[in-house]
A protein has these predicted regions:
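Polyanion-binding interface signature
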Residues: 1-81
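Ampiphathic alpha-helical segments that act as solvent-exposed interaction surfaces
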Residues: 47-55, 82-119
Length: 119
């Protein structure tokens, strides 16, 4: 499957995949250096909470998520535990999770794109 939304046209606002030896994640990362803009986009997405939950299911959010390098971003994400990039038997589960959740994030973004971009 080709991901349609590789560029949101919003600087420092992106959809990301992540997997390690314990879990897989799909996230919206809001990485603006200007905290006012970062907060504004986070609040826009968060205002769609019930729609977001309908589309992607249970999710986590953190307005002040600290990356390993110390950078503070805002992140909304879903994760699947019990999978590992080092265990080929869990790869189908990881790919299925990525397809399902990224598709849901893309649909939400496209449906509410004008609202989200209106900052």
């Amino acid at each position: 499957r080709k991901w349609l939304l590789y560029d949101t046209k919003i600087k420092d606002f992106s959809f990301k995949f992540y997997a390690d030896n314990k879990k897989a994640e799909v996230s919206i990362d809001i990485e603006m250096k200007d905290e006012l803009f970062r907060n504004a986009y986070y609040e826009k997405i968060w205002s769609l909470e019930s729609i977001l939950e309908d589309e992607i299911g249970a999710f986590s959010k953190d307005e002040f998520y600290v990356l390993e390098n110390g950078k503070v971003i805002s992140r909304i994400w879903v994760e699947k535990n019990g999978v590992s990039i080092f265990n080929k038997q869990t790869w189908p589960d990881i790919f299925e999770f990525f397809v399902e959740k990224m598709d849901a994030f893309e649909r939400l973004f496209y449906e509410y794109e004008d609202f989200i971009k209106d900052i």
